[in-house]
Design a protein with these regions (language model features):
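Regulatory, non-catalytic segments
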Residues: 129-138
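Basic nucleic-acid-binding alpha-helical/helix-turn surface characteristic of O6-alkylguanine DNA
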Residues: 5-126, 175-183
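Active-site phosphate/pyrophosphate- and oxyanion-stabilizing loops and adjacent acidic/basic residues
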Residues: 71, 129, 167
C-alpha cells in the first residue's frame, strides 16, 4: 500500500515536505519506506523508535524509489545484495547527522565498527556521544547500515529497531560483533 505522509518541521530541515510512503513486509517485520522525486527519504521498521508521524497518510499509486528500495531490501534479505544503490533524498537530519550517515555507508557488508572509530573516521574523535545520537536517528534502517556499529568491546548496543533485529542483521551478514570488527 502506498500513501502520502506529511513530515512536520520538527524532523525536517527548513520547510515541510510531502513524501510518498509504502509499507512492505520483510523477514524482520514490516517496514515503512518514504520517498520523494529525489530518492528514498527513509526506511523504518514500523515498530521502531523515531518513526515519523503516520497520521496524514493518503493512498497513491506507485513510486519508483519506493519500488526500487523494496526490491533491494528483499534481495538483501535473500542474500543476493550486499550494497544498496537506491538514491537517498536528504530531507532529514542536520549537516552533522548527514555526515555520520554518509560515513556509515563506507562500512562494508559483513564488517562492524565502534562508535569511537566512527567518530575518529569523521575527524571528531571526542564526539562519540554525538555520533551515537546521529547513528540512532538514522532514517534509512538497513540501507544506511547503522546496525554495523557496535560497542567498543564488540558488544551489541542500541538499535532503533531493537537489539534482536540488530543481531539478526549481523548474523545475516555473518558479522558477529568482535569477529570482523574494523575499528
Amino acid at each position: 500500500m502506498i500513501r502520502y505522509i506529511f513530515l512536520g518541521l520538527a524532523i525536517l530541515i527548513g520547510v515541510p515536505v510531502m513524501l510518498l510512503s509504502k509499507t512492505i513486509s520483510t523477514p524482520l517485520g514490516a517496514m515503512l519506506l518514504a520517498a520523494n522525486d529525489d530518492g528514498l527519504a527513509g526506511a523504518w521498521f514500523c515498530d521502531q523508535r523515531h518513526l515519523p508521524d503516520r497520521t496524514a497518510f493518503s493512498e497513491v499509486t506507485q513510486q519508483r524509489w519506493l519500488d526500487h528500495a523494496q526490491r533491494e531490501l528483499l534481495a538483501y534479505f535473500d542474500g543476493r545484495l550486499r550494497q544498496f544503490t537506491t538514491p537517498r533524498s536528504a530531507v532529514l537530519g542536520t549537516a552533522f547527522q548527514r555526515a555520520v550517515w554518509q560515513q556509515l555507508c563506507e562500512l562494508g557488508h559483513g564488517t562492524t565498527t565502534s562508535y569511537g572509530a566512527l567518530a575518529a573516521a569523521l575527524g571528531r574523535p571526542t564526539a562519540v556521544r554525538a555520533v551515537a545520537g546521529a547513528v540512532g536517528r538514522n532514517p534509512w534502517s538497513i540501507i544506511v547500515p547503522c546496525h554495523r556499529v557496535v560497542g567498543s568491546q564488540g558488544q551489541l548496543t542500541g538499535y532503533a529497531g531493537g537489539l534482536p533485529r540488530k543481531q539478526a542483521l549481523l548474523t545475516l551478514e555473518q558479522a558477529l560483533p568482535g569477529v570482523t570488527q574494523s575499528g
